[in-house]
Design a protein with these regions (language model features):
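Nucleotide-sugar donor-binding loop of glycosyltransferases
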Residues: 34, 93, 188-190
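Active-site microenvironment of metallo-dependent hydrolases
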Residues: 158-252
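Generic secondary-structure signature for well-ordered alpha-helical cores
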Residues: 21-28, 61, 137-144, 166-170, ...
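Histidine/acidic residue-rich metal-binding segments in metalloenzymes
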Residues: 1-88, 100-116
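Short glycine-rich, flexible loops that bind phosphorylated cofactors or substrates
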Residues: 76, 97-98, 126, 194
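Short, acidic/turn-prone active-site loops that include or flank metal/cofactor-
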Residues: 36, 93-97, 122-124
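Short, charged, surface-exposed secondary-structure boundary motifs
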Residues: 99-103, 127-129, 197
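His/Asp/Glu-enriched, well-ordered alpha-helical/loop segment
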Residues: 58-65, 107-191, 206-210
């Protein structure tokens, strides 16, 4: 359970402050979108006389129980603030590219100790919603923005697993270890996409064409088996989904 106004710029200052109080009364986390693009920076400076990160601090929206999506335009002061307070960031590289928001300074964030996880930002700005595809994109985008040494395959995968767990303030997920929640996925390395990459399966998984998972287990429950969803009647769901999508775009 998370208290999550969409953006601090779409609701009142009082609502943001009261949301922070409410979340901490119930011991749940806070989430919103912040510093996504240059327009956010300009609006925040004009409206509040401060950067989005400074505004978040003023509202009580920093701390280990808070994570912000994007933070593409987070400046040095904002990075240091988030590192000092343990405020997390959900990096959404595909969304940032689709909306031309820019390249989030993930390398600098991590070097300063900011908790960084990985997100897809929902279907409105990411039609694929592939987490392994997002891992690949995070790595490539950091490299194109900050150089070939900006991120390794292992680090990109770490952001998506251990990084996400830290951002969510969870110590029971993100790794395979005794006492942890039984969350894991399995990929078929016999797939043609990974041909020639078996000497380094981790790099192959991140760099090669993203494939669907062979098996997915969430909290001990098998959700995907042999590449197929095991929890729903997928053909029926897809048929209904396509009907509703057609009605929506046609105005029927």
């Amino acid at each position: 359970i998370v208290v999550a106004p969409c953006s601090p710029f779409s609701v009142s200052r009082d609502l943001m402050r009261e949301a922070a109080v409410l979340a901490r009364q119930y011991g749940v986390s806070l989430h919103t979108h912040l510093a996504e693009n240059v327009n956010d920076i300009a609006y925040s400076r004009e409206k509040f006389g401060m950067t989005p990160a400074e505004y978040a601090e003023d509202l009580g929206w920093v701390g280990h129980d808070v994570w912000h999506a994007h933070c593409v335009q987070l400046d040095q002061h904002g990075i240091e603030l988030f590192a000092r307070t343990g405020t997390g960031v959900a990096h959404c590289p595909c969304s940032n590219m689709r909306l031309a928001s820019g390249i989030a300074p993930v390398r600098k964030m991590r070097d300063h100790g900011v908790p960084v996880g990985l997100g897809v930002d929902g279907s409105a700005s990411n039609d694929g919603a592939s987490m392994i595809g997002e891992v690949r994109q995070a790595l490539l985008l950091q490299r194109v923005g900050f150089g070939p040494d900006a991120m390794t395959a292992r680090e990109a995968l770490e952001i998506a697993t251990l990084g996400g767990a830290k951002v969510l303030n969870r110590n029971d997920i993100g790794a395979l270890a005794p006492g942890m929640v039984a969350d894991f996925v399995a990929f078929d390395l016999g797939h043609v996409a990974y041909a020639g990459g078996h000497h380094d399966p981790l790099a192959a998984l991140v760099f090669c064409t993203p494939t669907q998972v062979h098996t997915s287990v969430i909290n001990g429950r098998v959700v995907v088996k042999d590449g197929q969803l095991a929890t729903v009647d997928l053909p029926r769901v897809l048929e209904r989904h396509n009907q509703l999508a057609h009605q929506l775009v046609s105005g029927a």
